[in-house]
Each structure stands twice: as structure tokens, then as C-alpha cells.
Amino acid sequence: MTDLRSATGPYFGDFGGRYVPESLVAALDELAEAWEELKVDPAFIEELKELHRSYTGRPSLITEVPRFAEHAGGARIILKREDLNHTGSHKINNVLGQALLTKKIGKKRIIAETGAGQHGVATATAAALFGLDCVIYMGEVDTERQALNVARMRLLGAEVIPVRSGSRTLKDAINDAMRDWVTNVETTNYVFGTVAGPHPFPAMVRDLQKVIGEEAREQVLALTGRLPDAVAACVGGGSNAIGIFHAFLDDADVALYGFEAGGDGADTPRTAATITKGRPGMLHGARSYLLQDEDGQTIDSHSISAGLDYPGVGPEHSWLSDLGRASYRPVTDDQAMSALRLLSRTEGIIPAIESAHALAGALELGKELGPDSIILINLSGRGDKDMETAGKYFDLIDAGAEQS
């Protein structure tokens, strides 16, 4: 197999690139140049590693879940516990690196987009830690379904701006954040949350998330004496997935599975299964798979999960799909919520709805691969933020009761 781990962008096969207004080219050049220097700078590497040790709580644990696995044909299932990180998800891995970079290039203000609010919370957290001004753009639909995370961001000192244009979700939040960056590029760094967007974001965010797979590869080897048969993760933009996939890309015997948000079903209009149902196009400065109409216009996505409700996907995932190195499958809202409840009741771990898509996919995967197989799942976040959605979905909240 070719050395897939060495891909650095700006292109991943036919995907990626940088299709942006002239006004952003200088900022992206500055960012790319700074990252190329810092990613091999021993002092920066050590400072980030120490931050992760003392602040994030890395390395994150792995947890085998045998009672859950009984429902997956008896396969051994091991979770990589990114839900245990400070702020509750994998997002902090990327944000601390980008916030540290912001300090190094002398900028005082950071902006970010957020869907589920996890990237926004992580960005607001890093801004508080480093003394940076912080503005978060969040679709109005998402501010309503993730109100808890909005409160967290504001408590941390960030300004949260609800985006009322378009579908009022993640895609529109990115559009407004990009507009802010164009206007304020001298003072502001855009802390992008996933492995999409224009170069250098897909490669840089991947570089900052690949710690997940590097740790997990060693941990699974130590626990089981061999590599897993399959690695599974949910895919929206795709940063948690590429983070765990990357260490295994050149291990030909390890199958990689990305589980997309199927919404009401991949064959319905209400879906976010971008690789399953989309075709190549341009969005947010890069070429990748997109959900689009016959005229090439991006169409609205749907998922019960705010973090997967995005009509695009990272260019490296598009490339891995075309190469056949990774497989991408849709998981419906109902399948994800069922898996969320199953993990909660069999193992006492409440996952984020995003992560529950990977859990649901792995239940089917285990039946395909059989009882001798080992499946590693990236549990990308915890479910605290989703209690209102889960409470309504499963009718868990007493009528008239107020949430405390």
C-alpha cells in the first residue's frame, strides 16, 4: 500500500485545494507558513504535549465494552474515550494547537464556527486560557437545540452570534465566520473546527487530531496483542474520524469505517450522508463530496445531531473513499438514538449523539465481522449537551418538570 499517512495537502487526490476570495489568500498563506514551521518546532511540540497532559487529560483511556458488544455479534468492542477530555470531546485537541499558534503569530482575537457547540466550547475555553478575545458563530437552529453549550461559551467569556441566514445551521455559521475573517484579518485568526475548508485547514486539523489514533494504536496493541480488524468513527466534517484513522492508514489489514448522518434515511431528502449520496463540488474553499441539486447548488442537510448536520465533508475523506481505503455508511437518526440508549444502559456511558452514529454502525459491523473480530470506536464526545434532545426523543422528562 502507498504511504497514505504522508499526504500533506493542499490536494488529496482530486480533492481539497484553496478556492477563496483574494482577500483571504494572504491570511491562509500566513497560517500555512506558521503551521509548517511550528509543527516541526520541538519547543512548540513540547508545549502542546504538556498542555494536553496537564489540561486536556491526555492520553485518553480506552475502555472495552463487553455488555454492549453482546449486541454486536460478540465482537470485541473497544472505545477510545475522547469523551473524557476536558470540555467533553475531541475538539480540544485541535483548538489548543490553533490557539497556541494564534499566540505565536501575535494575533489577539479568535473566531470559530460551531454546530453542536463542542468546538465553540473548546475554542472559548482556549481563549480564556490564553487571554484571547473570542467570537463564536452558531446557526440559530443549533443555538436552540444546544442551549447548554451556548451558556457554557458565554460563561467562558465568548460572544456567541446566532446566524439567521440560510438553513441557520453549521454551513451558514462557517459562511459568517469567513466574512468576519475577511474583514478583521489583521487582528483575527479563524480557529476552524474540522478537516474541511481551504488549505491548510484539512491538513493542520488532521495533524492536531492524529494524536487520537497514535495513542489508540499503542493502547489496543497493549491490551489485545494485535491491531483491530476495524476502526469506526462518525463523520460530519470528519476531524474525529481522520484523527483515529490516520495512525492505521498504512495498515492494510485494518478496515476503516466512517458512519455518516443518515437523518431520516439516506434515500430521503432529510439526510446528511454526504459521501453516500453526494458528488464532488466546491464548498467553503475546497473541492470535496457535497450534497447538491442538479444545478450544483448545495442543498440543506438534516441530522438529529447538530455536529453532523453538514452538507460537505473533509477532502481527505473524499479521497480515502475514492481510493477504497475507507468505507462510508449512513446511520439514521433512529439507529443512532437506539445505540445511544444501549451504551448508556449496558455500560453506564452516555455518548454524544454524533458518537452514537459510530456505535450504531459498529453494532452491524460486529455481526458482519464475527465474534473473533476487534472493533475500535472513537467515542468522540459525551452526551451531556444532548440531554434535552434525548429527553424529548425518549420521553424522559416529566410533564411540567423544569430542568435543573
Swiss-Prot record:
It catalyses: (1S,2R)-1-C-(indol-3-yl)glycerol 3-phosphate + L-serine = D-glyceraldehyde 3-phosphate + L-tryptophan + H2O. Its cofactor is pyridoxal 5'-phosphate. Pathway: Amino-acid biosynthesis; L-tryptophan biosynthesis; L-tryptophan from chorismate: step 5/5. The modification N6-(pyridoxal phosphate)lysine is found at K91. The keyword Chaperone does not apply. One of its GO terms (molecular function) is tryptophan synthase activity. InterPro entries: Trp_synth_b_CS (IPR006653), Trp_synth_beta (IPR006654), Trp_synth_beta/beta-like (IPR023026), TrpB-like_PALP (IPR001926), TrpB-like_PALP_sf (IPR036052). Its EC number is 4.2.1.20. It is an enzyme of class 4 (lyase). One of its GO terms (cellular component) is cytoplasm. It comes from the Bacteria. The keyword Disulfide bond does not apply. CDD domains: Trp-synth_B. Disulfide bonds: none annotated. Keywords: Amino-acid biosynthesis, Aromatic amino acid biosynthesis, Lyase, Pyridoxal phosphate, Tryptophan biosynthesis. Transmembrane segments: none annotated. Tetramer of two alpha and two beta chains. Belongs to the TrpB family. The beta subunit is responsible for the synthesis of L-tryptophan from indole and L-serine. PANTHER family: TRYPTOPHAN SYNTHASE (PTHR48077:SF3), TRYPTOPHAN SYNTHASE-RELATED (PTHR48077). This is Tryptophan synthase beta chain. The lineage of its organism: Bacteria, Bacillati, Actinomycetota, Actinomycetes, Micrococcales. The gene is trpB.
